[in-house]
Amino acid sequence: MNENLLMIIGSQFGDEGKGKFVDLLSNQFDYIVRYQGGDNAGHTIVFDNKTFKLRLIPSGIFNPRNRVVIANGVVLNPITLLEEVKYLKSNGVSTDNLYVSDKCHVIFNFHIEMDKMLEELKGSKKIGTTNKGIGPCYTDKVSRVGIRVCDLFDFNVLLAKIQDNLQIKNVLFSRYGKQIFNPYTIAKQYYELGQQIKPFVINTVALLNYAYERNNKILFEGAQGIMLDIDYGTYPYVTSSNVIGLVSSGTGLAINKIKRILGVVKAYSTRVGSGPFVSEIEEENLAHYIREKGHEYGTVTKRPRRIGWLDLFLLKYVVTVSGISEIAITLIDVLSKVQKIKVCIGYKRNDKQLNYMPSSIEELQKCEPIYEILDGWSEDVSRIKSYDDLPLNLKRYISYIENFLKVRVRFVSVGPDRNQTIIKDN
């Protein structure tokens, strides 16, 4: 097993607390690499007794020993990047260790407007996008009309590409009564943005391959969660990129297989926006209690998250398709004082138990959960430092998870701070 490479991924619908473990483990690595997604997924990190909320810059930015890389698989909004750089610097955090791929596709303001318009036109069938332009930018990428960071530095090249890109978009904007975009105005704005981000821009493919050849330690930071993966998630209620298998194509680092994959699992389930959610808690008072105690509101959208019981049937599927080798359990402290804790161990439809994860969204929406009920615990666990000192029923809960998934739990998080993390298994 190559211990120099670690991938950290969310194992549910996002918002699992990945950023905490990137921050926690960053001291052991030379490079922290974001390889997919955009500024649609926020991550929260508590550093130096301050809470930071970022959408684009990787969590490793708080450790000056790390080289923090936004690789080519990311779609980049330069406005967000500059806002976060300013935000970090104003709080005493250096961004001298930040590197941005010149191959990143750029999110323009017309992508954001297209995102909003398409969602509006769907009416009651809207997916619940964050309206950050992610989908339209990825659409341009696969349609071969996308504009990359390297295109921002030559005004004439940039203008020509924007003119080509807006030919069809402006027709659609006009058709649906929206404002059309002036290519020259857009080119001028984004050329200037390009000059501002230029100090961070580098050929990250060469940078990462050089690091790999020198046996530097590299941590890959995933965004969103596997059940939002465009191929393996609850399509179409998913993000626009692959959460799992994009490391090689999203970084340019030809790795046959990363053997060490840390899956971050929330002790219960949450989901933002529309889409099937089999283990959703129907008792609104209990869902409200967990939502408030766990501060379950979107980092980017501020929308209240839907609350559900831990879905082990779903997680078994996630482990199968992702190759997760170890687990970090987060927000276990939120479940303190919940007397009876349900875990979903299977799905049934028409009273028939399923032995597979349905691909059809229509079938999934008709599924009912099969629950096992476990005893809860009343103790406050937020100050406990040793696994042995955790309440017996909490340890039984974790053992149940391990036995069901056949994957070891390595970390147990009992609070948001870095020091509120128990190492169960070295």
From Swiss-Prot:
Encoding gene, per UniProt annotation: purA
Claim: Transferase is one of the keywords in the record: no
Names of required cofactors: Mg(2+)
Residues that bind Mg(2+): D15, G42
Family: Belongs to the adenylosuccinate synthetase family.
GO cellular component annotations of the record: cytoplasm
Compartment(s) of residence: Cytoplasm
InterPro entries to which the protein is assigned, alphabetical: Adenylosuccin_syn_GTP-bd, Adenylosuccin_syn_Lys_AS, Adenylosuccinate_synth_dom1, Adenylosuccinate_synth_dom2, Adenylosuccinate_synth_dom3, Adenylosuccinate_synthetase, P-loop_NTPase
Main localization (coarse): cytoplasm
Disulfide bonds: none
Binding site for substrate: T299, V300, T301, K302, R303, P304, R305
GO biological process, one term: IMP metabolic process
Binding, GTP: 14-20, 42-44, 305, 331-333, 413-415
Reaction(s) catalysed by this chain's protein: IMP + L-aspartate + GTP = N(6)-(1,2-dicarboxyethyl)-AMP + GDP + phosphate + 2 H(+)
EC number: 6.3.4.4
A GO molecular-function descriptor: adenylosuccinate synthase activity
Subunit structure: Homodimer.
Pathway(s): Purine metabolism; AMP biosynthesis via de novo pathway; AMP from IMP: step 1/2
Function: Plays an important role in the de novo pathway of purine nucleotide biosynthesis. Catalyzes the first committed step in the biosynthesis of AMP from IMP.
Note accompanying the cofactor annotation: Binds 1 Mg(2+) ion per subunit.
Catalytic residues, chain numbering: D15 (proton acceptor), H43 (proton donor)
The protein's name in its UniProt record: Adenylosuccinate synthetase
Binding site for IMP: D15, E16, G17, K18, N40, A41, G42, H43, T130, R144, Q224, T239, R303
Alphabetized UniProt keyword annotations: Cytoplasm, GTP-binding, Ligase, Magnesium, Metal-binding, Nucleotide-binding, Purine biosynthesis
